[in-house]
Amino acid sequence: KFDDNCYELTVLRWFRDNFVSKEDIEHYYEVAPIIVEAINKEEQSDIIYDYIYDNIVDYCVEQIEQGNYDKAYSRYKNSVLILEEQFAKPVLINRFVKTLKLKTNN
């Protein structure tokens, strides 16, 4: 777990505020809590978070430090979409099915 003011988060926030589109930021804030919720339910969540740190956070910070903003943005955006497909989509489908069941039972 990160300290809220750690170096990596500070760099990533600067990058977000200066380079990430408003639409991508809004999308991230919609899906990120669902992704985290789903990962936290996984038996090997620590391994998943280590992977995210090593392959997304650390990579993006390194690219930002080197001024490779396009590479950082590409990795960030693709990673969010992959994590959404892997973790958020099943949660959202499950919620939708439960809603439909409630409506048909009433």
Predicted regions and their residues:
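Long, compositionally biased charged/polar accessory segments in the mid-to-C-terminal portions
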Residues: 1-106
